[in-house]
């Protein structure tokens, strides 16, 4: 059997998507997480729930060396990939932090690590293979999400931004990383027409880990208030179960076998932000990201 790889598969959206795919019992499901014990326990629980072949693998997206190690191990395993979901993400709003590679954490984990991972795994993709980049409505100022509008400058500057430790800029860096996800999805679709590459907005989901860096009151609202709002579909608040089912559909359903270069809100194809269609920016991001993720020599 071929495999479906889902980064960040131990909880929330990634867990629910992996569980849905595993329930089909016709593909190996590989989930990743930073903590090996946790991801292996999650895989064991998912195998018991679904009867599917679920495998847990450690992957620290905060280290490009770890991304390369993971990709090499997967290639050595010889397991062809039907689909990859670039799902794992962080949102650092308190202060300015950096990865082991010296890159700003939100940009490095949400964009650069997945850019490198996909590039390294391309030789393992089956014909017509699918790649889904999990983005967010925060990338689009026209959606008025309350998050500061993304500010794309260059890949190099996003990796090493000016020193601004304010929560506002932390949220802006998150929105910008989600814009980069959409730009990358579109550029990858253009460069590899043999693949099916799309971006996905799961909606605002309570119960996920993205609010872990927020102040206590906001974390409380995330856990207690937002779940109630899922009862009002017009507000765009969705449960991880609902969005996970949609992501699983994009990854494996025959319905989307020929769909590429699109942006989905749930299962509905929609327009992304105006800036996300700027091919000049997409090329600069691609080329800059390739430089930033190349192995360092000397």
Summary of predicted features, one role per range:
Residues 1-209, 295-296:
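Rossmann-fold NAD(P)H-dependent dehydrogenase/reductase core
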Residues 4, 19, 255-298:
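C-terminal helix-and-tail extensions that cap enzymatic domains
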Residues 42, 180, 184, 243-246, ...:
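Alpha-helical packing segments of well-folded alpha/beta enzyme cores
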Residues 162-171, 204-242:
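Alpha-helical membrane-targeting segments
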Residues 177, 226-269, 279:
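C-terminal helical subdomain
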Residues 191, 199-201, 205, 210-211, ...:
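C-terminal/domain-terminus segments
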